[in-house]
Amino acid sequence: MKKYDVIAFDLDGTLTDPEHGLVEGFIYAFKKMGVTDYGDRDSLRRFIGPSLYKVWQDEFGFTPETVVEAIEKFREYYNIYGWWDNKVYPGIREMLAELKKAGKTIVLATSKPEDTALKIMSLFELDQYFDFLGGAKGDNRDHKWQVLEYSLDAVGADRKSAVLIGDRMYDAEGAAKCGVDCIGVTWGHGSQKELEDAGATCIADTPEDVLKMLI
């Protein structure tokens, strides 16, 4: 496999499992907005990963103004209770430590709001392994590809020597838009088929698999 000097990571579903806190936040927001046909808890997992603005407009027919209100309701819950209702996947710390030891430049590129992402990285002490932490911020840095560009530019990354590691099709699609390879991981919220259909360069089933590909 080609050598990568800069390793970009997604957060939700890749480094940490945020499912319980996020799903509780989704349910809170939908109830506040009067939405009753949002499905069961398992079906709400599909909202983990992408930018909620476009997804909720497409799924529920929210107007741009209404989706902003819905996301504000979601954040009422999530910013107090949901963000720390989270856990690091097994093997992640060891993987990051080995990548750092190998001299890789490591950055975060998440569609989660940057201030929340920074709190999560600090809470779990994952920030110590990273050279730069990038997240969504405003209309000009909302989509995955925009955040990835931001994080890669921050460390002066050559796109040919960079790779994004993520668990959803949005990661593979965002990486492709930036001209960057993508390692799709199956321990998160996307399937191998979803990742392959979206154009992931290769698939890893465990953090140990990622290490074997990168070192």
Where do the protein language model's features map onto the residues?
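Glycine-rich phosphate-binding loop signature in dinucleotide/nucleotide-binding domains
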Residues: 1-2, 101-104, 154-159
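N-terminal helical cap/lid subdomain that shapes the substrate entry/recognition surface
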Residues: 2-93
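Conserved Lys-Pro-Asp/Glu-containing loop-to-beta segment of HAD-superfamily phosphomonoesterases
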Residues: 6, 144-173
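Substrate-recognition element of Asp-dependent hydrolases with the DxDx(T/V) motif
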Residues: 26, 92-121, 136
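Conserved H-loop
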Residues: 36, 126-131, 158-159, 201-204
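A short, structured active-site edge motif that brings together acidic residues
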Residues: 127-142
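Acidic, Mg2+-coordinating phosphoryl-transfer loop and its flanking beta/alpha structural elements
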Residues: 163-204
